[in-house]
Curated annotation (Swiss-Prot):
PROSITE patterns, per the entry: CRESS_DNA_REP
Domain CRESS-DNA virus Rep endonuclease as annotated: residue spans: 8-116
Keywords (A to Z) from UniProt: ATP-binding, Covalent protein-DNA linkage, DNA replication, DNA-binding, Endonuclease, Helicase, Host nucleus, Host-virus interaction, Hydrolase, Metal-binding, Multifunctional enzyme, Nuclease, Nucleotide-binding, Nucleotidyltransferase, Transferase
Record carries keyword Cytoplasm: no
Natural source organism: Tomato mottle virus (isolate Florida)
Annotated stretches, region: Oligomerization: 156-176
Name of the protein: Replication-associated protein
Cellular compartments annotated: Host nucleus
Location of the motif RCR-2: 57-59
Motif RCR-1 per record, residues: 15-18
Entry EC no(s): 2.7.7.-, 3.1.21.-
Cofactor(s) named in the record: Mg(2+); Mn(2+)
GO MF term list: ATP binding; DNA binding; endodeoxyribonuclease activity, producing 5'-phosphomonoesters; helicase activity; metal ion binding; nucleotidyltransferase activity; structural molecule activity
InterPro entries in alphabetical order: CRESS_DNA_REP, Gemini_AL1_CLV, Gemini_AL1_REP, Gemini_AL1_REP_central
Length: 361
């Protein structure tokens, strides 16, 4: 008669099942952490489940830094701290730690310690299909959570396609920019030039009627602190583009009424999207730096705000001989306003600011 086969398991990943175990997850984790092994433990995850008769059992994944050889089938036994009871597990080497972790995660009553060590076995034909992984990523709720899912379940894609995956997820999970709340109401701007007010009335005063198909834009030039930015931003929902053009979904929305272009040098706008923005063109693309092309819905006017002087003034820029063609186009698509005084009376906005502070207090 051959001698009984000696117990021996050698693996980096151990899957333990305690069929009848009344210990809490926390107590079990503490005892497993304190086991002395020649190989460092890297990760432990425990799930507590109930049998149909209400008796609890535990599933455990233990990951080691390297292969650990276990020759004592009582090594992973747990002990009750309150009574004389031992809990003996079924011990298996786990071929795919990802599959075991997914199995343990299914009921949600879990606790873990350490950093999960990703393996590629699941992605090479285990239980976790690519479609399942990406569906799980879409349901993760955020870019970082989705990336964590794919890092664990689709490591090859995560490494080789990281840039594309991250870019796509950022677009998928992009939130609309928070609406800007103006500190002053439009009614506080009492010195708005007639032509400037007429432009605003023609575009914003249509009520329920459809806006013009190709609305005219407006270029407002004036000294600093004349109120032009506050006026422009108080008219309604808008995109605010300042200093440079940024069509990132975190700051730019296709569901606004107009664009505010503030302190963007005319030579820069000429190189980018002068005609698209000032001409209220529809359905055009912008190639963002280090990103994929962004589709712009368009069809809305721009309020361009600038200061006088070389390099800032749009009027001076268009008066240059090399910009004659662009000037002729712009005259047909925008009106020009030069401010000679602030758009507000200081007493009007001061009283409104006081009222706002009282309402907030």
């Amino acid at each position: 008669m051959p001698p009984p086969k000696k117990f021996r398991v050698q693996s980096k990943n151990y899957f333990l099942t305690y069929p009848q175990c009344s210990l809490s997850k926390e107590e079990a984790l503490s005892q497993l952490q304190n086991l002395n092994t020649p190989v460092n433990k890297k990760f432990i995850k425990i799930c507590r489940e109930l049998h149909e008769n209400g008796e609890p059992h535990l599933h455990v994944l233990v990951q080691f830094e390297g292969k650990y050889q276990c020759t004592n089938n009582r090594f992973f036994d747990l002990v009750s701290p309150t009574r004389s009871a031992h809990f003996h597990p079924n011990i298996q080497g786990a071929k795919s730690s990802s599959d075991v972790k997914s199995y343990i995660d299914k009921d949600g009553d879990t606790i873990e310690w350490g950093d999960f060590q990703i393996d590629g076995r699941s992605a090479r034909g285990g239980q976790q299909s690519a479609n399942d992984s990406y569906a799980k990523a879409l349901n993760a709720g955020s870019v970082q959570s989705a990336l964590a899912v794919l890092r664990e379940e689709q490591p090859k894609d995560f490494v080789l396609q990281n840039h594309n995956i991250r870019s796509n997820l950022e677009r998928i999970f992009a939130k609309a920019p928070e609406p800007w709340v103006p500190p002053f109401q439009v009614s506080s701007f009492t010195n708005v030039p007639d032509e400037m007010q007429e432009w605003a009335d023609n575009y914003f005063g249509t009520g329920d009627a459809a806006p013009p198909d190709r609305p005219v834009s407006i270029i407002v030039e004036g000294d600093s602190r004349t109120g032009k930015t506050m006026w422009a931003r108080a008219l309604g929902p808008h995109n605010y583009l300042s200093g440079h053009l940024d069509f990132n979904g975190r700051v730019f929305s296709n569901d606004v009424q107009y664009n505010v272009i503030d302190d963007i040098a005319p030579h820069y706008l000429k190189l980018k999207h002068w005609k698209e923005l000032l001409g209220a063109q529809k359905d055009w693309q912008s190639n963002c730096k280090y990103g994929k092309p962004v589709q712009i819905k368009g069809g809305i006017p721009a309020i361009v705000l600038c200061n006088p002087g070389e390099g800032a003034s749009y009027k001076e820029f268009l008066d240059k001989a090399e910009n004659t063609g662009l000037k002729n186009w712009t005259i047909k698509n925008a009106i020009f306003i030069t401010l000679t005084a602030p758009l507000y009376q200081e007493s009007t906005q001061a009283s409104q600011e006081t009222g706002n502070q009282k309402a907030q207090g």
